[in-house]
Amino acid sequence: MEKAVSTTELTTSFGWDTRQAFEQQDVQELSRKLMERLEEKMKGTVAEKALPELFVGKTKTYISCINVDYESSRIEDFWDIQLNVRGNKTLEDSFRDYIQVETLEGENKYDAGPPYGLQDAKKGVIFESFPPVLHLHLKRFEYDLNALTMMKVNDRHVFPMEFDAAPYLSANADMSESWVYELHGVLVHSGSLDAGHYYAFLKPTKDGYWYRFDDDKVNRATEKEVLEENYGGEYEFANGTTGVRQPYTQKYSTKRSMNAYMLVYIRKTRSDDVLLPITKDDVPSHIGKTE
């Protein structure tokens, strides 16, 4: 009988002890720890640039004067993009919110220095490039000003199987090939801020099936299970229904407490390079053994 592979070696490499390994960890922080450790191990090897080439994109933060030819800007790398859920109904809404332009005028004019002085200006962020593998962090946990505490945002937020990232790129971006991305991973959080559980839906091949990975259980999944069941939002109730008991919290709620927390998209023009077939030689011998 086949057994699930132990994660002990992985968590030990993060410096976690047994107690930390069994605590609920934030999946975005875990992803960053994994990337950091892999980068450390790859330094000085032929694979040193492999991770940045796969996962790193670039943003430009800018302040551009409206009436004179002056712009202040800086280019920065990103490994993932944090997108607001609250106030945005779709993934496209969240991207538009991210690159929304602020106008600096009146008492809030921008000081462009000599010889221009105070100027009306546009301030914002735009993407210079997206990586072949794009990690999107949906901000499901936020500080609630009314409750004065961190709360989970269970609002409905729709994400597509495919989306075009071109509208969010700067005018100078390379448009020689398509910027359409296809969904290949959905990391779900079920529960509340204090009590919950993570599981994942993954499509490991270009044209294959979706699978649900939940602790040591792996099952085939439908597109409905991948998409609609993880948008969050209100349940559809029959008349008189007061709510549904939520897993982990055991409280009744009119909103789904299971919803997407991270999304993994792969650029379609690069999918053949990213999703290479995995052979037995690629799997370490001690992991490939079955009992």
What are these regions (language model features)?
Residues 1, 43-46, 69-291:
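Exposed substrate/partner-binding surface patches
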